[in-house]
Amino acid sequence: MIEADRIISASPKREEEVIDRAIRPKLLADYVGQPSVREQMEIFIKAAKLRDEALDHLLIFGPPGLGKTTLANIVANEMGVNIRTTSGPVLEKAGDLAAMLTNLEPYDVLFIDEIHRLSPAIEEVLYPAMEDYQLDIMIGEGPAARSIKLDLPPFTLVGATTRAGSLTSPLRDRFGIVQRLEFYSVDDLTSIVKRSADCLNLNLSPDGAYEVARRSRGTPRIANRLLRRVRDYADVRNNGVITSDIAKQALAMLDVDSEGFDFMDIKLLQAIVERFDGGPVGLDNLAAAIGEERDTIEDVLEPYLIQQGFLQRTPRGRIATSRTYAHLGIAKLD
């Protein structure tokens, strides 16, 4: 199964973009969670405005779905400037980047998502732009080619990535501010779900919000997606009223359990416990047992299970923890 097809996938879905923009917080005052990031950014933005300067270049990293794009837009809104948005894979030629840079107004924000996927040629153009607000471009071809420098207005580059370790050192070192986004607590996600429900004019009880939040794997994007599907269920089965019981019924219908696991997570855990006596089991054997690719298990299924303490990676293989046995309702043999 493709990761993006799972309802608990943190990957963005194109059809969700319009609604996501409508419920996305616009200012730091509306931004829930990430208290350290919020406090730091409030100070940095106020200081830049007091000095009438562009905000330092900002790198935001962390798992998908935690609000990197949201934070980039908040920075632009708080600074009172425009934001231009692109992504690493889209910037194929130096001219593409040059066109964006030369159209910036003073203090504008240039947001590059998936910045770890920039080509080396694009990075070379970025270095002087970030450091000196200058653009080095080549005019002409062959022996007649010459380099000219163009002055750029002061601007803020905001880069977002799920793989900070994949950035080259020269690029990473040019960011004056680096922020890591962490998974959200259930309390913070409950607040996010309530806010989204208000934006969408939903009839949502506090207990209903909690049931959605606790299954959202620490990720606002998943929380908002589950809320929309629960809304569909409530519209058909309960006149649009989302109670705790309605939320539980809707999420059970979607095969999302109390831990936010779907059938793929459960299939993996059951295989380790029931077919391999809890492990250790090698990755190849596990992949064959559940009919999934090695990469899918390693990159998609395992990270959240490990982070929540349901699975251990060891040199000898994967091992199910006591939490797995308790969750599956299976007695652990000594």
Curated annotation (Swiss-Prot):
Residues 258-334 are annotated as: Head domain (RuvB-H). It is found in: Cytoplasm. InterPro entries: AAA+_ATPase, AAA_lid_4, DNA_helicase_Holl-junc_RuvB, P-loop_NTPase, RuvB-like_N, RuvB_C, WH-like_DNA-bd_sf, WH_DNA-bd_sf. Mg(2+) binds at T69. SUPFAM superfamilies: P-loop containing nucleoside triphosphate hydrolases, Winged helix' DNA-binding domain. CDD domains: AAA. Its EC number is 3.6.4.-. It catalyses: ATP + H2O = ADP + phosphate + H(+). GO terms for molecular function: ATP binding; ATP hydrolysis activity; four-way junction DNA binding; four-way junction helicase activity. Residues 185-255 are annotated as: Small ATPAse domain (RuvB-S). Keywords: ATP-binding, Cytoplasm, DNA damage, DNA recombination, DNA repair, DNA-binding, Hydrolase, Nucleotide-binding. Gene3D superfamilies: 1.10.8.60, P-loop containing nucleotide triphosphate hydrolases (3.40.50.300), Winged helix-like DNA-binding domain superfamily/Winged helix DNA-binding domain (1.10.10.10). GO terms for cellular component: cytoplasm; Holliday junction resolvase complex. It holds the Pfam family RuvB_N. ATP binds at I23, R24, G65, K68, T69, T70, E131, D132, Y133, R174, Y184, R221. Homohexamer. Forms an RuvA(8)-RuvB(12)-Holliday junction (HJ) complex. HJ DNA is sandwiched between 2 RuvA tetramers; dsDNA enters through RuvA and exits via RuvB. An RuvB hexamer assembles on each DNA strand where it exits the tetramer. Each RuvB hexamer is contacted by two RuvA subunits (via domain III) on 2 adjacent RuvB subunits; this complex drives branch migration. In the full resolvosome a probable DNA-RuvA(4)-RuvB(12)-RuvC(2) complex forms which resolves the HJ. PANTHER family: HOLLIDAY JUNCTION BRANCH MIGRATION COMPLEX SUBUNIT RUVB, PTHR42848. Belongs to the RuvB family. The RuvA-RuvB-RuvC complex processes Holliday junction (HJ) DNA during genetic recombination and DNA repair, while the RuvA-RuvB complex plays an important role in the rescue of blocked DNA replication forks via replication fork reversal (RFR). RuvA specifically binds to HJ cruciform DNA, conferring on it an open structure. The RuvB hexamer acts as an ATP-dependent pump, pulling dsDNA into and through the RuvAB complex. RuvB forms 2 homohexamers on either side of HJ DNA bound by 1 or 2 RuvA tetramers; 4 subunits per hexamer contact DNA at a time. Has 3 domains, the large (RuvB-L) and small ATPase (RuvB-S) domains and the C-terminal head (RuvB-H) domain. The head domain binds DNA, while the ATPase domains jointly bind ATP, ADP or are empty depending on the state of the subunit in the translocation cycle. During a single DNA translocation step the structure of each domain remains the same, but their relative positions change. This is Holliday junction branch migration complex subunit RuvB. The gene is ruvB.
